[in-house]
Structure formats: structure tokens, C-alpha cells
Amino acid sequence: MAKKSLIYREKKRQKLEQQYHLIRRSSKKEISQIPSLSEKWKIHGKLQSPPRNSAPTRLHRRCFSTGRPRANYRDFGLSGHILREMVHAGLLPGATRSSW
């Protein structure tokens, strides 16, 4: 189980990313449309003004049940070992154990 502080920090980053998403998108669109280099630098400075944690690259997927940051499956939102336990227990409909 991940520390509670790390889980809360990730949730805070998600909120910040949603809050500043439109500002970042509009600034990037302006940069692509303006041909003048000096104006691009001004807009680039405005793009750097939001908090660092509001950048989408700072987000990290975490397991829904344990908060583990590694080996996550996007389709389920679970880490690998929790996914395996749930499939073996029959808790995930449609998921089957592999055998070859």
C-alpha cells in the first residue's frame, strides 16, 4: 500500500492539471498561429507561469485499490498483482486466466 501522502499529492496534481488545462491549450494554440518570434517568447513566458505540478507530464497512474505507481493496466486501473488476484478470484467479469 502506498503512503497516503503520495496518493493525496497525486490527487492534488490531477486537480491542478484540470484547472490549468485550458490555459495551457490556448497558449500552445496561440504559439502555433503567431509567426513573430518575439511574440512567441512572450506567450511562452505566459505558458511557464502556471504551477509546475499542473503540467500533464507530472501525473502518474496509480492503482485504484493500493495506490501502487508501477505496473498499472489502463483498462482496469489496477496494478499487476492486484489484477491477477482479482482475476483468479473471479471478480473481474470477462477476464480469464491465460493458459498455454
Curated annotation (Swiss-Prot):
It is found in: Plastid, Chloroplast. One of its GO terms (molecular function) is structural constituent of ribosome. The keyword rRNA-binding applies. It comes from the Eukaryota. The keyword Electron transport does not apply. One of its GO terms (biological process) is translation. GO terms for cellular component: chloroplast; small ribosomal subunit. Disulfide bonds: none annotated. InterPro entries: Ribosomal_uS14, Ribosomal_uS14_bac/plastid, Ribosomal_uS14_CS. Keywords: Chloroplast, Plastid, Ribonucleoprotein, Ribosomal protein, RNA-binding, rRNA-binding. SUPFAM superfamilies: Glucocorticoid receptor-like (DNA-binding domain). Pfam families: Ribosomal_S14. PANTHER family: 30S RIBOSOMAL PROTEIN S14, SMALL RIBOSOMAL SUBUNIT PROTEIN US14M. Binds 16S rRNA, required for the assembly of 30S particles. Belongs to the universal ribosomal protein uS14 family. Part of the 30S ribosomal subunit. This is Small ribosomal subunit protein uS14c.
